[in-house]
Amino acid sequence: MRIGVLTSGGDCPGLNAVIRSVVHRAVADHGDEVIGFRDGWKGLLECDYMKLDLDAVGGILARGGTILGSSRVQPSHLRDGVERAKGHVEELGLDAIIPIGGEGTLKAARLMSDNGLPIVGVPKTIDNDIAVTDVTFGFDTAVGVATEALDRLKTTAESHQRVLVVEVMGRHTGWIALHSGMAAGAHAIVVPERPFDIEELTKKVGERFEAGKRFAIVVAAEGAKPRPGSMEFDEGGKDVYGHERFAGIARQLSVELEQRLGKEARPVILGHVQRGGTPTAYDRVLATRFGWHAVEAVHRGEFGQMTALRGTDIVMVPLAEAVETLKTVPAERYEEAECVL
């Protein structure tokens, strides 16, 4: 068989582990040929690819990012995108395509599948917001990076008697904020699923200082918002791909808290460091398993599906289910965190 692989959307620790696993299983065990499209769907649309053999994937298991490159270009962005992709698949004699990506990539994968292309998807996102899989690779690494940063920030916050508002990734869901905040013992967490009341947040932080504490750490997912009308808030706008471009919750919240508390407050934006660098052992293993099972699904002809973790098992689920809803932080999970903040 001849299999095409691509990585699309934001980069994520563990992408190279999937690529490596696909090549090892397909080439070494099944005798397949594997090619990798450069820069995601853009590579397929432009027929820009490289051969992937065992030498090409040597030494990439622990490497962050993706050796194939990535972009946010989707076939649906072009008027003839779907037909162009279908033409290149036929021209290259591909038996299957394995796209690795998050919500946007999986929506494109479903579109391609609905138009007759042989697709087996692999989910990735540090946000952990894909509903049909228990965990996505990259999440564990991102939480670890954010937790270490929070641990380090405590000492500088205490030294200067500051409130630090630490912004972590999470456009629509607060999983990174929730887990890193719990792990680091933050004093407040705000997430997109639960618009915060600025009065309640101010009271919570203020009570720490009244009790003689010298600092406070607030963890904010980038998509967190206040309750309507509770404080002035810039919503931001959209980028060229239609994704929300946030105006900076940490900056706005730190200004508000400083004014209300009379304490020095500073924003800290962790940004892309959360999704860069070497993946954790957990993410390497999960990504490797996803790659292995994606190749097996190709050989079984299970197209229009994607890999997912259920418990300790890797299963295949329809792409249609994968893009229906996001996995958001439920109220009970937030309540668990609240009791220890």
Describe each PLM feature range.
Residues L44-P99, G104-T105, F137-G144, E148-A149:
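Glycine-rich oxoanion-binding loops at beta->alpha junctions
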Residues A17-V22, E103-L117, A177:
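Short Gly/Thr/Asp-enriched flexible loops that form oxyanion-binding sites at enzyme active sites
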